[in-house]
Protein backbone atom coordinates (compact mmCIF):
# COMPACT_ATOMS: atom_id res chain seq x y z
CA UNK A 1 0.00 0.00 0.00
CA UNK A 2 2.93 2.34 0.67
CA UNK A 3 4.08 2.05 -2.93
CA UNK A 4 0.57 2.81 -4.21
CA UNK A 5 0.30 5.88 -1.95
CA UNK A 6 3.71 7.10 -3.12
CA UNK A 7 2.72 6.58 -6.77
CA UNK A 8 -0.50 8.53 -6.23
CA UNK A 9 1.56 11.53 -5.10
CA UNK A 10 2.64 12.05 -8.71
CA UNK A 11 -1.01 12.72 -9.60
CA UNK A 12 -1.41 15.04 -6.61
CA UNK A 13 1.69 17.07 -7.49
CA UNK A 14 0.96 17.29 -11.22
CA UNK A 15 -2.80 17.88 -11.05
CA UNK A 16 -4.06 21.08 -12.70
CA UNK A 17 -7.17 22.31 -10.86
CA UNK A 18 -8.22 24.64 -13.70
CA UNK A 19 -8.81 21.72 -16.08
CA UNK A 20 -8.69 18.54 -14.01
CA UNK A 21 -5.90 17.30 -16.28
CA UNK A 22 -2.57 15.93 -15.05
CA UNK A 23 0.86 16.67 -16.50
CA UNK A 24 2.20 13.71 -18.47
CA UNK A 25 5.72 14.62 -17.34
CA UNK A 26 6.59 15.96 -13.90
CA UNK A 27 6.07 19.75 -13.73
CA UNK A 28 5.58 20.07 -17.53
CA UNK A 29 2.00 21.18 -18.31
CA UNK A 30 1.20 18.97 -21.30
CA UNK A 31 -0.66 15.71 -21.80
CA UNK A 32 -1.91 13.29 -24.44
CA UNK A 33 -5.01 11.10 -24.51
CA UNK A 34 -2.77 8.11 -23.69
CA UNK A 35 -1.42 9.85 -20.60
CA UNK A 36 -4.86 11.13 -19.62
CA UNK A 37 -6.15 7.55 -19.80
CA UNK A 38 -3.28 6.59 -17.48
CA UNK A 39 -4.58 9.24 -15.07
CA UNK A 40 -8.07 7.69 -15.21
CA UNK A 41 -6.49 4.32 -14.39
CA UNK A 42 -4.60 5.84 -11.45
CA UNK A 43 -7.69 7.70 -10.24
CA UNK A 44 -9.73 4.49 -10.33
CA UNK A 45 -7.01 2.53 -8.52
CA UNK A 46 -6.63 5.25 -5.87
CA UNK A 47 -10.37 5.20 -5.21
CA UNK A 48 -10.67 1.43 -5.10
CA UNK A 49 -7.61 1.05 -2.86
CA UNK A 50 -9.01 3.65 -0.47
CA UNK A 51 -6.16 6.11 -1.04
CA UNK A 52 -8.74 8.79 -1.85
CA UNK A 53 -12.35 8.98 -0.75
CA UNK A 54 -15.46 9.20 -2.91
CA UNK A 55 -15.64 12.99 -2.58
CA UNK A 56 -12.08 13.44 -3.93
CA UNK A 57 -12.71 10.92 -6.70
CA UNK A 58 -15.94 12.68 -7.70
CA UNK A 59 -14.35 16.14 -7.62
CA UNK A 60 -11.51 15.03 -9.86
CA UNK A 61 -13.68 12.97 -12.21
CA UNK A 62 -16.28 15.71 -12.68
CA UNK A 63 -13.59 18.29 -13.52
CA UNK A 64 -11.79 15.91 -15.88
CA UNK A 65 -14.97 14.94 -17.76
CA UNK A 66 -16.10 18.58 -17.98
CA UNK A 67 -12.79 19.44 -19.64
CA UNK A 68 -12.86 16.38 -21.89
CA UNK A 69 -16.37 17.39 -23.02
CA UNK A 70 -15.19 20.88 -24.00
CA UNK A 71 -11.77 20.22 -25.55
CA UNK A 72 -11.33 21.81 -28.95
CA UNK A 73 -10.79 18.87 -31.28
CA UNK A 74 -8.37 18.44 -34.17
CA UNK A 75 -10.35 19.59 -37.23
CA UNK A 76 -13.55 19.06 -35.21
CA UNK A 77 -12.90 15.32 -35.36
CA UNK A 78 -10.98 13.86 -32.44
CA UNK A 79 -8.73 15.06 -29.62
CA UNK A 80 -5.46 16.63 -30.71
CA UNK A 81 -2.27 14.68 -29.96
CA UNK A 82 -1.39 17.06 -27.10
CA UNK A 83 -3.06 19.60 -24.81
CA UNK A 84 -1.78 22.14 -22.33
CA UNK A 85 -2.90 20.88 -18.92
CA UNK A 86 -3.36 24.39 -17.44
CA UNK A 87 -5.39 25.95 -20.26
CA UNK A 88 -6.81 22.83 -21.92
CA UNK A 89 -5.80 24.25 -25.30
CA UNK A 90 -4.46 22.26 -28.26
CA UNK A 91 -0.67 22.38 -28.42
CA UNK A 92 2.21 20.91 -30.39
CA UNK A 93 4.90 18.73 -28.83
CA UNK A 94 6.77 21.83 -27.59
CA UNK A 95 3.60 22.93 -25.76
CA UNK A 96 3.05 25.87 -28.10
CA UNK A 97 -0.53 26.59 -29.27
CA UNK A 98 -1.62 24.72 -32.37
CA UNK A 99 -2.91 21.42 -33.62
CA UNK A 100 -0.80 18.53 -34.82
CA UNK A 101 -3.17 15.65 -35.50
CA UNK A 102 -4.63 12.77 -33.54
CA UNK A 103 -3.49 9.33 -32.48
CA UNK A 104 -5.98 6.49 -32.89
CA UNK A 105 -3.90 4.43 -30.45
CA UNK A 106 -4.08 7.14 -27.77
CA UNK A 107 -7.80 7.52 -28.38
CA UNK A 108 -8.23 3.74 -28.20
CA UNK A 109 -6.60 3.69 -24.76
CA UNK A 110 -8.86 6.55 -23.65
CA UNK A 111 -11.89 4.60 -24.92
CA UNK A 112 -10.82 1.61 -22.78
CA UNK A 113 -10.74 3.71 -19.63
CA UNK A 114 -13.90 5.66 -20.41
CA UNK A 115 -15.71 2.32 -20.75
CA UNK A 116 -14.23 1.02 -17.49
CA UNK A 117 -15.30 4.18 -15.64
CA UNK A 118 -18.77 4.03 -17.20
CA UNK A 119 -19.22 0.39 -16.14
CA UNK A 120 -17.82 0.78 -12.60
CA UNK A 121 -19.34 4.19 -11.90
CA UNK A 122 -22.57 4.45 -13.91
CA UNK A 123 -23.32 7.90 -12.50
CA UNK A 124 -20.74 9.17 -15.01
CA UNK A 125 -22.34 7.36 -17.95
CA UNK A 126 -24.09 10.38 -19.45
CA UNK A 127 -20.98 12.56 -19.32
CA UNK A 128 -18.87 9.81 -20.84
CA UNK A 129 -21.43 9.13 -23.57
CA UNK A 130 -21.44 12.86 -24.37
CA UNK A 131 -17.66 12.77 -24.84
CA UNK A 132 -17.70 9.77 -27.17
CA UNK A 133 -20.76 10.96 -29.12
CA UNK A 134 -19.05 14.31 -29.66
CA UNK A 135 -16.12 12.71 -31.45
CA UNK A 136 -16.08 12.07 -35.20
CA UNK A 137 -14.41 8.71 -35.83
CA UNK A 138 -14.90 8.71 -39.63
CA UNK A 139 -11.18 9.22 -40.36
CA UNK A 140 -9.90 7.09 -37.45
CA UNK A 141 -11.27 3.67 -38.40
CA UNK A 142 -12.39 2.23 -41.72
CA UNK A 143 -15.07 -0.43 -42.40
CA UNK A 144 -12.39 -3.16 -42.30
CA UNK A 145 -11.33 -2.10 -38.83
CA UNK A 146 -8.01 -0.47 -39.71
CA UNK A 147 -6.96 2.34 -37.35
CA UNK A 148 -5.74 5.66 -38.73
CA UNK A 149 -3.96 8.54 -37.07
CA UNK A 150 -3.68 12.05 -38.45
CA UNK A 151 -0.89 14.57 -38.87
CA UNK A 152 -0.53 17.85 -40.73
CA UNK A 153 1.51 18.19 -43.91
CA UNK A 154 1.67 21.69 -45.38
CA UNK A 155 -1.33 22.60 -43.26
CA UNK A 156 -3.47 19.75 -44.59
CA UNK A 157 -4.48 16.66 -42.62
CA UNK A 158 -2.99 13.34 -43.70
CA UNK A 159 -4.55 10.12 -42.43
CA UNK A 160 -2.18 7.18 -42.13
CA UNK A 161 -2.53 3.65 -40.81
CA UNK A 162 -1.40 3.64 -37.22
CA UNK A 163 -0.28 0.73 -35.17
CA UNK A 164 2.44 -1.58 -34.05
CA UNK A 165 2.22 -5.14 -32.82
CA UNK A 166 0.63 -5.01 -29.39
CA UNK A 167 -0.24 -1.31 -29.35
CA UNK A 168 -2.57 -1.63 -32.31
CA UNK A 169 -4.47 -4.53 -30.77
CA UNK A 170 -4.74 -2.64 -27.48
CA UNK A 171 -6.03 0.49 -29.22
CA UNK A 172 -8.44 -1.65 -31.23
CA UNK A 173 -9.84 -3.11 -28.01
CA UNK A 174 -10.92 0.38 -26.97
CA UNK A 175 -12.76 0.94 -30.24
CA UNK A 176 -14.29 -2.53 -30.01
CA UNK A 177 -15.69 -1.80 -26.54
CA UNK A 178 -17.71 1.01 -28.11
CA UNK A 179 -19.10 -1.15 -30.92
CA UNK A 180 -16.62 -0.53 -33.73
CA UNK A 181 -15.58 -3.38 -36.02
CA UNK A 182 -11.85 -3.79 -35.46
CA UNK A 183 -11.21 -7.01 -37.39
CA UNK A 184 -8.11 -5.67 -39.18
CA UNK A 185 -6.55 -3.80 -36.25
CA UNK A 186 -7.30 -6.65 -33.82
CA UNK A 187 -5.33 -9.16 -35.88
CA UNK A 188 -1.60 -9.43 -35.16
CA UNK A 189 -0.89 -10.51 -38.75
CA UNK A 190 1.11 -9.76 -40.77
CA UNK A 191 4.24 -10.32 -38.77
CA UNK A 192 7.40 -12.38 -39.19
CA UNK A 193 9.31 -14.57 -36.78
CA UNK A 194 13.08 -14.52 -36.51
CA UNK A 195 15.34 -17.40 -35.57
CA UNK A 196 17.45 -16.56 -32.53
Q: Language-model features: where?
A:
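Low-complexity, Ser/Thr/Pro/Gly-enriched N-terminal "stalk/linker" regions
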Residues: 1-31, 75-78, 82-83, 177
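Hydrophobic core segments within long, regular secondary-structure runs in both alpha-
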Residues: 1-12, 40, 58-69, 111, ...
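Short, well-structured alpha-helical interface segments that form or flank functional binding sites
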Residues: 6, 34, 59, 105, ...
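Short amphipathic alpha-helical segments enriched in hydrophobics
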Residues: 11, 15, 40-43, 47, ...
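A generic secondary-structure boundary signal that marks alpha-helix termini
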Residues: 13, 48-51, 70, 119, ...
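Surface-exposed patches in mature extracellular/periplasmic domains of secreted proteins
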Residues: 19-24, 51-57, 123-130, 186
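Membrane helical hairpin/interfacial module
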Residues: 27-102
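Extended ligand-binding clefts on enzyme/binding-domain cores
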Residues: 74-107, 113, 117-196
